Amino acid sequence: MDVDSIFKNTEETNKKRNPEEADSLEPASSRRRLAEENSDEENEEFDEEGGRFFGSGLKKSEKTVLDFLDEQEAQEEPASLTPTELKRMVVRLEKTINNNQELRIKYSTSPQRFIESEADLDLEIRSFNVLSEYPILIPIFLKLDCVSTFLELMNHENADITITVLELLIELTDEDVDPDALNSLFTSLIDSGLLPLLSNTIKRFDESNEEDRHGVYCVLSLMENLLSVDNSICSIIVENTTLVEWLLSRSSVDETSISTNLQYAVEILAIILANSKEAKLKVCNLNGIDLLLRRISPYRLRDPTQGSEEEMMENVFDCLCSLVQETKGKSLFLKEEGIELCILNMKHKGKSRYSTIKVLDYLLFGPLSTPYCIRFVEAGGLKYIFAAFMKISAADTLEHILAILASLFRSLPADTVERVRFLRKFIENDFEKMKRLFKIYDRLRIQLKGIDQSRKLDFSPDSEEKSTKWFLQQIDHGLFPFQSTVLILSWLCVENTVTLKKIKMLFSEASIPIDELTDALKNYHENLEEPTVESEEVEANDSYYRIDEKPMVTVLLGSMQASV
């Protein structure tokens, strides 16, 4: 049967329906006979059950052919990849690679003579995508040294081949792949030098070209997959590649409309910084604090647009959160007037305010944070952090605000103008800040008591897993913000008689023994670890005292017990 002649014959299918036939008064049998003589298409178009739009639009002969093809497909069993077929695929790939190389050498000045071989090579590489559905064959894939083959192909002169290999590796390292197979493939890729190769590959691409932009995206996507398997490779990325430098440089590029690659580069940089101290120090040395502050500077005046720009902004703030956890990062943040920018962001009350508060939390926390706390007060930060404290109810942001207030109590030197200004904020407007603080304390106290009661009813054998489970339950129900409220209320008790009197009144009105506050502080103290001093911290901030948490709380607890 000539299938082409059937589908290409338009003589009948192009006929128009005769309105006179539709209005015919002939018996139904005569009309059916007439329709059969003309074409099944007319019957399909005016099917009584569904109207012409529900018909198949096919003649009987065409429908017969399609039914036959459907039956043939139904009878065929879906092909499955076997070890033997995988070996054949590898052999075909090697032959295609060799053929392409020979033609490239032979016709180096005539690309049209070898372009077909590269199309064949592209198809052979893509054929390996199916391997992600057969993780049991990954060991054979590795034994056949396919990793080396594909990594060599990443250096191919044709960037399209490089991109096809990247797409294959993305597919094979997807999180949905069997964990055991993924881990073995991951180890082989890292041991074979994939990370330095990615560093060189990403520099090959010119993002002014659409295909190359896709290549950059593929490198970033593969990096994300690898980091999700094991983020310990961050140390290799820092020591053996220039990927951090590239990511920082790409993150600082100004774009009128934030591109996917810019957003992705900042996201990958944030992941690396969150998992590597070496990366944090490297970015600090590369003037990264200044570059990232410039990146978020526009948001002191406007909000980012939804989508890529907003996500990019959040990732930049995450980068800064990681950097200011290091002593060097804190110092550079102060030097580059990061605190002043944060205050402008809080003043704007836009989307950046919440992320700004998070950065300030990490900046002001720590044993060497006195200069940053002083600068925060000097720059006028108290007005805006307390305004946020009184209005913001989102649990995660409120947790950061409470931590900031606790850090200010910890680090602002006694009998200084900055500390006096800070204390006055709790007293002004009829103690409104203290009243709100107490309400938060009481709400969190009740939540955590509920967890303690549930734990007492858990009669399963004691184990580390059980302890972890209940500790996580406490965290979910506000353990950390509760600890901050305990510290703040305790400081207010020992600062002066006015604040102590007000706190006693608040506890009395709520029928809560103030001894509960002392007990909560004691419990917090017992769970603190002994302080450790890192080498770079010894050299930093020698003009200020080091204030470690446990010794500070020890003194606070003694003063608290004496006061109440």
From Swiss-Prot:
Compositional bias segments (type: Acidic residues): 37-48
UniProt-annotated stretches for the region Disordered: 1-56
Keyword Acyltransferase: no
UniProt cross-references to InterPro entries, sorted A to Z: ARM-like (IPR011989), ARM-type_fold (IPR016024), CTNNBL1 (IPR039678), CTNNBL1_N (IPR013180)
Signal peptide (from-to): none
Annotated localization: Nucleus
One Pfam family, short name: CTNNBL
HEAT repeats: 83-133, 138-177
First and last residues of every ARM repeat: 179-229, 230-276, 277-326, 328-366, 367-411
GO CC, alphabetical: nucleus; spliceosomal complex
SMART domains xref list: DUF1716 (SM01156)
Role noted for this protein: Probable spliceosomal component involved in the activation of pre-mRNA splicing.
This protein's name: Beta-catenin-like protein 1 homolog
Organism of this sequence: Schizosaccharomyces pombe (strain 972 / ATCC 24843)
Gene encoding the protein: ctnnbl1
